[in-house]
Regions:
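HIT superfamily nucleotide-processing domains
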Residues: 2-191
């Protein structure tokens, strides 16, 4: 479960969270102890990940979600951690989409610049973007930061959507997540 952070909170170091729900972080992201990768503006955290706003006025609500534990490649992440991370991405993606009323939220997991496993969540607004078919990295508009009051509003809006999702989830009994059936490597078909 994701726990939101209010924009007016004092940030202090967290105590470990026993569950996998995104929650309100009570800290500034001190970064990975191994590589130093950190988020700009923390929004929410779970036992697996931390969500933060990437300050880019071209894509209001653009965020990064990073694994708390250091892994350099997605294929090295244990299944339980990866499942929790993907669940957090899904919750964050839905919250951002609803908060900023985006047509969609692109998810990109690259690892070319930062070796720490993380995902970019980029709200897209094709009806108002000059280049809706191009990736955010190729967007020709000048990258500028959001005004501080807009950042605080986004934190609050995303948190409100995370809270709504959490209430819905707690009122319905979720189906247990089962690991995928083991497949012998000889059964895998490569394209």
């Amino acid at each position: 479960m994701i726990t939101p952070r209010t924009s007016s909170e004092t940030l202090t170091l967290p105590s470990p969270q026993p569950d996998s729900t995104l929650k309100n972080p009570t800290f500034s992201d001190s970064g990975c102890h191994e590589c130093g990768f950190r988020l700009w503006i923390p929004v929410a955290e779970s036992c697996h990940s931390t969500l933060g706003i990437y300050n880019d006025a071209r894509f209001p609500g653009r965020s990064i979600i990073r694994l708390k534990e250091h892994f350099e490649d997605l294929s090295d992440v244990p299944l339980e951690t990866l499942t929790g991370f993907m669940r957090d991405i899904q919750v964050a993606q839905k919250a951002i989409r609803a908060a900023v009323r985006a047509a969609r939220v692109n998810v990109a997991i690259l690892g070319n610049r930062e070796s720490h496993v993380h995902a970019h969540l980029i709200p897209r607004f094709p009806e108002t973007e000059d280049f809706p078919d191009c990736s955010p990295w190729n967007d020709q508009r000048k990258k500028t930061p959001l005004r501080p009051e807009r950042v605080h509003a986004l934190v609050d809006q995303i948190n409100a959507q995370i809270t709504v999702a959490d209430r819905r989830r707690s009122s319905s009994k979720p189906a247990p997540i089962k690991p995928p059936t083991q497949v012998a490597s000889s059964q895998l078909t490569l394209f």
